[in-house]
């Protein structure tokens, strides 16, 4: 069995007038993330980690932000496409460990639903999707509630 590890990061600015999507679910919040797609930073970080692990470049290469095909697209679709891309090289998702950095909204109660949604899209067990949430103790752009960032580490496998 061949095992590879990948790391991903994403950040988007918070703005008024957009829906907030994180981990494939819509959260009630007065601001949302600005981006070409739905701007789900958690899914984007996971996509980058998966693509990196398979040595397949990054999310911007496969799903460019200047393409009308991806305008306002649901990031779960991008994640499903990413899983298919790595499967094309014989890989499957082993596990995901991710962290979201945000002052608000508090994410603890939403994490189980995010895990279920992401596990379903990636075709893995819920136990294979770890999501953590933290703040930056009011420091930096996330601390000032100007944006949200996410980090993801993944393991992919092939026989």
How does the language model describe each region?
Residues 131-135:
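Pyridoxal 5′-phosphate
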């Amino acid at each position: 069995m061949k095992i590879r590890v990948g790391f991903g990061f994403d950040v988007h600015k918070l703005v008024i007038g957009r829906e907030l999507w994180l981990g494939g679910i819509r959260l009630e919040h007065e601001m949302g993330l600005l981006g070409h797609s739905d701007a789900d930073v958690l899914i984007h970080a996971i996509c980058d980690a998966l693509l990196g692990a398979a040595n397949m470049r990054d999310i911007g290469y496969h799903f460019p932000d200047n393409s009308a095909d991806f305008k306002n697209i649901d990031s779960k679709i991008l994640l499903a496409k990413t899983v298919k891309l790595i499967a094309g090289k014989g890989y499957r998702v082993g596990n995901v460990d991710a962290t979201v950095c945000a002052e608000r909204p508090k994410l603890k109660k939403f994490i189980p639903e995010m895990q279920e949604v992401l596990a379903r899209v990636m075709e893995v067990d819920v136990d294979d999707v770890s999501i953590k949430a933290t703040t930056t103790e009011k420091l930096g752009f996330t601390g000032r509630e100007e944006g949200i960032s996410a980090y993801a580490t993944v393991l992919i496998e092939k026989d």
